[in-house]
Amino acid sequence: MKVTIKAQSKNRVRLEVPFRCTAAVQLYLEEEKRLFPEITQIICYKDEKHIAFTFETGHESSVYRFLDHLEVTTLNEKQRDFTVDAQVTPVDIVVSHIYRKLV
């Protein structure tokens, strides 16, 4: 899987990935993250092409092992799965409330 490093520090890396990070893909990533305890957090950006990984200091190689561990066929299936709704954030609630008031 070809990824592009956009930013990196001692315990965080932001990558551009070749798959869309939909809600179903996010759930799949969280499930697979359990096998890599040194990865502490996965953050998917709203543009669905960038992902940030937070990891324990000195374990940046575990991020690349994690990405190699992911199955491409499963990722493709999850990208097409629109039955899983994204988590509702407080901003989404406020925006929908304002929209209903205006309409």
Regions inferred by a protein language model and the residue ranges of each:
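Charge-rich, low-aromatic oligomerization/scaffolding segments with amphipathic character
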Residues: 57-74
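Short glycine-/aliphatic-rich beta-strand segments at the starts of folded cytosolic domains
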Residues: 1-21
